[in-house]
Regions:
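Non-heme di-metal
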Residues: 1-222
Length: 222
């Protein structure tokens, strides 16, 4: 019988996938301090920010701000996933904890880069970040299989976004391109896990495509 929950018969296979993810992630473990151009930093009290200090094209800055304001919602994303998968497969709860720890560095890296390079008005970016987090995240999908599908698509979209922005940024700041590609590696691993969870369910019961198609048709980034 088709349900919108995850199938407990798949838990052993998903546990194997989770262990494989941890091994792959450990091989590329990193700290966000490794990817920041610290030598470009200046004291904002001693040298106040001025628009003349900005060196990146406005389109690149907008892309980085967009990524940052998506990543800062991690607490809301984690709350959403934890609530949605409560009572479902324990391995998914374990993965969400790992996913959160790996995603936690992303907003720190992006915001610190923008501040170090003086690419944004520090007061404005602080206000934007606060406003976005206060606004929260209202999901459109509330069942485990739909949430899994939504997160798969979101990770894929974010991975593609980071890689595309890195291509453009490489002409203006190699440091930025490098850190974006590093973020894309995390997104690639996360996407692969979520995708494979969906794949195993489709292999077991092809009619899961009913729920999956609904998410695909109505998907939008947070």
């Amino acid at each position: 019988m088709l349900t919108n929950d995850l199938d407990f018969r798949l838990e052993p296979r998903l546990k194997e996938m989770y262990e494989q993810h941890k091994i792959r992630a450990q091989k590329i473990d990193w700290g966000y301090h490794e990817f920041l151009p610290w030598d470009k930093g200046m004291d904002f009290k001693r040298v106040p920010w001025d628009e003349s200090q900005v060196t990146l094209p406005s389109g690149v800055i907008t892309a980085i701000e967009t990524a940052l304001l998506t990543e800062v919602n991690l607490p809301w994303f984690t709350t959403y996933l934890s609530a949605t998968f409560k009572g479902s497969l324990s391995v998914i709860t374990d993965f969400i904890h790992t996913w959160t720890s790996e995603e936690d560095q992303h907003s720190n890296l992006l915001e610190t880069y923008l501040l170090l390079t003086r690419s944004v008005n520090p007061k404005r970016i602080h206000e934007l970040r606060k406003s976005v987090v206060e606004g929260g995240f209202e999901p459109d999908f509330h069942t485990p299989i739909e949430a899994m599908t939504y997160t798969t698509l979101q990770e894929l979209a974010t991975m593609v976004f980071y890689n595309n922005v890195a291509k453009v940024a490489s002409k203006h700041d190699p440091d930025l391109a490098t850190l974006l590609r590093r973020l894309a590696k995390d997104e690639t691993l996360h996407y692969a896990f979520y995708r494979d969870v969906i794949r195993t369910h489709l292999e077991l019961e092809p009619n899961y495509c009913y729920h999956i198609a609904n998410v695909i048709k109505n998907f939008k980034m947070p």
